[in-house]
Amino acid sequence: MTLNDVRLGTFDGSNYNKGAGLIKTILWYFVNALIVRASWNPFMGIKIALFRAFGAKIGKGLVIKNNVVVKSPWNLVVGDDCWLGESCWIDNLDKVVIGSNVCISQGALLLTGNHDYTISSMPYRNAPIKIEDGAWIGAKTTVCPGITVHRNAILTVGSVATKDMEQNGIYQGNPAVKIRERKIKE
C-alpha cells in the first residue's frame, strides 16, 4: 500500500449526524423492516402514521405502495397528493423535501449520501434533495445528492439526475440531459 491509497479502515462516519438518537434509529430499523416495508401490509394509513411518528412531515393524500424504503423518516418532508411507487428508495442521510403532486415511480432512488473519494478514509459527502411541485421521477431512476428537481420537471425511466433539472424540463439519460419541454394540457 502506498501513502495515497484508499484506507477504508480509517472511515469513522464522524462527519455524519443521523438526526436521531441511537434508540430511535434502532427502533425505526425494526419498525421499517417488520411493518412499513412488509409486503403483507397493504395499509397506507399505518405506514403514513409510522412515518409521522418517527418525525416525517407528510401532507394529505399520500399514496405509498409496498416495499418503499425510507432510511430516516425524520429527514423527510412530503407535500399533498404525492405517490411513492413500489420499491422506491429514499436514502435520506440528509433532508429530502418533496413538494405536492409529485410522483416518485417504482424503483426510483433518491440518494442524499455519497463519499469524498479524494480523501483516503472516504468520509461522507451528503447533500439534500428538493423535488418541487408537479415533478415526476420515473421508474428505476436515480436523483443524486444536492439536486433540485424544479416544478413540473420529468426524469424519464432509467435516467440519472446529476445536475439540477429546470422547470418543465424533460430529462433523459445518464447523466440526464434535457430533451424537451413539458407542456401540460388542462
Feature-to-residue mapping (PLM):
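Short, functionally important structural connectors and interaction interfaces within domains
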Residues: L50, K60-L62, V70, S121, ...
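Flexible, glycine/small-residue-enriched loop-and-beta-strand segment within the central core
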Residues: A38-I48, V68-V78, W83-T148, N174-P175, ...
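Terminal amphipathic alpha-helical/low-complexity segments used for targeting or macromolecular assembly
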Residues: M1-A56, K60, G134, N152, ...
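Beta-rich strand-turn-strand
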Residues: A139-K163
